[in-house]
Regions:
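Alpha-helical transmembrane segments in multi-pass membrane proteins
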Residues: 17-88
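Juxtamembrane helix-loop-helix connectors linking adjacent transmembrane helices
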Residues: 44-62, 89-161, 250-252
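Alpha-helical transmembrane segments of multipass membrane proteins
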Residues: 27-35, 72-76, 109-117, 121, ...
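Membrane-interface elements of multi-pass transporters and channels
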Residues: 37-48, 86-90, 119, 123-131, ...
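Cytoplasmic juxtamembrane interface segments
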Residues: 5, 80-98, 228, 232
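Alpha-helical transmembrane segments
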Residues: 14-32, 105-110, 185-188
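Transmembrane helix-loop-helix hairpins at the membrane interface
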Residues: 115, 146-252
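Short, Lys/Arg-rich, polar N-terminal cytosolic tail immediately upstream
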Residues: 1-13
Length: 252
């Protein structure tokens, strides 16, 4: 009886144990960490840089890849929920609620993340988004045009992935005792970085360290609602972490 109760506590489980976090990490991100690490290691070889970049681009734009990831993540999410149900995790403690403030927080957070992304892109020499010659091509209506050009699968996958990642990082990884929160925060940064290394070390650090900490402190001490982060992350998956790219008309 004691063994069964240790697995499935009588009272709802508010604080996850270290083994809960490790098991859920492997379930939700183990495969993606392996894939990302493999692509990153391949990119370090000069002879494979071009092929890796081409493969990454093709995967990102391929509907079949969206469908494959969608199915896999849905399956892993289902297994994770089953595990949490067995552990009698207290889902009610997660603040997921719709309010009018969501319509403010989502675009505001996306804009902050997007502008920072544009600064990083410009300073790294990838592309100068702050070139004055781009000003005439800025059109807010471009947001609608770019959204309308997305496929239903791309939108569906972005929504799923936004929930998938932030449910883990901001939801589950904050379900720990206060004395462990800083250690778990460091752990969350490492995990965020580890499955984004396929984008290059610079962007893996930006996403994992800068964005990860920004999301955490904003959620924990200001917003206190997971929904805006689910939706904002979905927008970033749809359009990338760039505000100016979204606003600029690129058609000639």
């Amino acid at each position: 009886m004691n063994f069964i109760q240790s697995i499935h506590p009588a009272k709802p489980l508010r604080y996850l144990k270290w083994f809960d976090i490790l098991i859920i990490t492997v379930l939700m991100f183990g495969e993606f960490i392996i894939r990302s690490t493999q692509q990153f290691m391949e990119s370090l070889s000069p002879s494979t840089v071009a092929s890796v970049a081409e493969t990454t681009t093709n995967v990102a734009s391929d509907g079949a890849a969206y469908s494959s990831n969608f199915t896999f993540q849905l399956m892993m999410l289902g297994i994770t929920f089953l595990y949490l149900l067995i552990r009698n995790y207290d889902f009610k403690q997660l603040p997921i609620r719709f309010s009018w403030s969501v319509f403010i927080w989502v675009p505001l957070i996306f804009a902050i993340v997007g502008i920072f992304g544009d600064i990083v892109t410009t300073l790294s020499g990838e592309y100068n988004y702050f070139n004055p010659q781009l000003i005439p091509f800025i059109d807010p209506m471009e947001i609608i045009r770019k959204f309308m050009s997305l496929t239903p699968m791309a939108i569906g996958y972005a929504l799923l992935n936004g929930f998938y990642e932030e449910f883990f990082f901001l939801g589950l990884l904050t379900s720990v005792k206060e004395k462990h929160q800083w250690l778990v925060l460091i752990y969350s940064v490492i995990i965020r970085i580890s499955f984004h290394t396929y984008q290059g070390l610079l962007w893996a650090l930006v996403i994992g360290l800068v964005y990860g900490l920004f999301y955490y402190f904003l959620y924990k001490y200001v917003v206190k609602n997971l929904l805006p982060f689910f939706l904002m992350h979905a927008l970033a998956d749809m359009f990338g972490s760039s505000l100016l790219y979204l606003l600029i008309t690129w058609r000639t």
